[in-house]
């Protein structure tokens, strides 16, 4: 239909410039399918596509999952682990259920998006990456921003390209 064609045209432009994309819509509208479509339309089609569901990972573990950690950074960290941001280098990092990301983690993600750099947990070296960020949510992020449950600066940084998927009913 016309709405989907319009969304795909916007997605095509987003893919060509590697801008951050925010995909919103009800559960089951195909947000991850759209993220994969963006990947297939752009120069990152043969590069890594790393998906992480922010709601499925404990807040205490999310930072080390995204950014990795150095040996000895915490109990049980016996050797260095690459984070998903590093694994996705030159490709796309898909952050599903971004609205579930804890507030204390949001400024770290914001900096990583803006600077395309980050530090592993327990590390001192800045690592540079080239990652397109695609985030998705089925929740009302503007309302969450108003209620101070989601950072406004991260919200606006993520929605450089804003795709709202219509319900499939």
Locate the predicted segments by residue.
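Conserved post-Walker A coupling segment in P-loop NTPases
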Residues: 3, 9-76, 82, 86-102, ...
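Conserved helical "switch/dimer-interface" subregion of ABC/ABC-like ATPase nucleotide-binding domains
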Residues: 10, 41, 69, 108, ...
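AAA+/SF3 P-loop NTPase mechanochemical coupling elements
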Residues: 50, 80-94, 102-108, 119-138, ...
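Short gly/ser/thr-rich secondary-structure transition/capping motifs
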Residues: 72-79, 115-120, 143
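Short acidic-aromatic loop segments in the C-terminal HATPase_c
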Residues: 99, 114, 159
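Conserved H-loop
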Residues: 100, 141-143
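Short, intrinsically disordered, charge-balanced linker/junction segments flanking boundaries
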Residues: 140, 147-150, 164-169
């Amino acid at each position: 239909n016309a709405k989907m064609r319009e969304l795909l045209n916007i997605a095509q432009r987003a893919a060509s410039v590697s801008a951050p994309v925010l995909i919103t819509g009800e559960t089951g509208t195909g947000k991850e399918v759209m993220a994969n479509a963006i990947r297939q339309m752009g120069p990152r089609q043969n590069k890594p596509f790393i998906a992480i569901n922010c709601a499925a990972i404990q807040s205490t573990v999310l930072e080390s999952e995204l950014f990795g950690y150095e040996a000895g950074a915490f109990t049980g960290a016996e050797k260095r682990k690459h984070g998903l941001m590093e694994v996705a280098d030159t490709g796309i990092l898909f952050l599903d259920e971004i609205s579930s990301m804890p507030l204390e983690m949001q400024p770290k993600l914001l900096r990583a998006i803006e600077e395309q750099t980050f530090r592993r947990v327990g590390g001192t070296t800045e690592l540079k990456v080239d990652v397109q960020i695609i985030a998705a949510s089925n929740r009302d992020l503007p309302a969450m921003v108003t209620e101070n449950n989601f950072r406004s600066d991260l919200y606006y940084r993520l929605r450089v390209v804003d795709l709202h998927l219509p319900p499939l009913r």
